[in-house]
A protein has these predicted regions:
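Positively charged n-region of N-terminal signal peptides that target proteins for export
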Residues: 1-6
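C-terminal motif of bacterial Sec signal peptides marking the signal peptidase cleavage site
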Residues: 15-19
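Soluble, non-membrane globular domain cores that form compact, hydrophobic packing
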Residues: 21-116, 122-189
Length: 189
């Protein structure tokens, strides 16, 4: 009888030891979800036109007050002359290089207002600083245009928000620059 109890205790001990060893290996194994891609990573990159559409909707922008230049709509693309006019600066000595631009959408006022939004996507994020220089030229030109007769609009242009994130770069001349930028950042991240 003592022998059978001893054998039972020994078997029980070995079973418990073996079971603990198996659990230790399971806990050390990598989890299957470690190499998965999240839904956000699978979604297609947002277009500049989609970003501007969201801004127009969210901030109730009256699009009748603006010309829209959208890369995805061939009839509304910027031509070389318009690019030079918009971004070369007040003295037109700069020849803007938009060769890294793969997408854009702009709202440019048709009224006497400085309000303007431009969002660009680049194939090389290192070109963002150069693009920001062109946007600064645009803001300075708009500020000087309005300075003699509309100080509020001139100030709006002087306070332009010019920024970038990843391959997107933008400028915003509105009364709600930071709110619009938050919308842009929400959409591109």
């Amino acid at each position: 009888m003592k022998k059978s109890i001893l054998i039972s205790v020994l078997l029980l001990s070995l079973t418990m030891l073996f079971s603990c060893t198996q659990n230790a290996h399971i806990e050390e194994a990598p989890e299957y979800g470690d190499n998965t891609v999240s839904f956000d990573e699978l979604k297609a990159p947002v277009t500049c036109g989609e970003i501007v559409s969201e801004i127009v909707t969210k901030f109730s922008v009256n699009t009748e007050d603006f010309d829209t230049f959208d890369y995805s709509v061939e009839e509304s693309r910027l031509d070389e002359g318009t690019i030079s006019y918009f971004y070369s600066g007040q003295d037109f000595t700069v020849s803007p290089d938009f060769s890294h631009v793969t997408d854009y959408c702009l709202l440019v006022p048709v009224t006497t207002a400085a309000t303007e939004i431009g969002i660009f996507k680049l194939d090389d994020a290192s070109a963002a600083e150069e693009m920001k220089g062109y946007f600064a030229n645009r803001a300075a030109a708009r500020a000087s245009t309005f300075a003699p007769y509309n100080e509020a609009e001139s100030e709006k242009a002087r306070d332009a928000l010019i920024s970038s994130e990843g391959s997107y770069v933008w400028y915003i001349m509105t009364d709600t620059n930071s709110d619009i930028e938050s919308t842009i950042l929400e959409m591109i991240k």
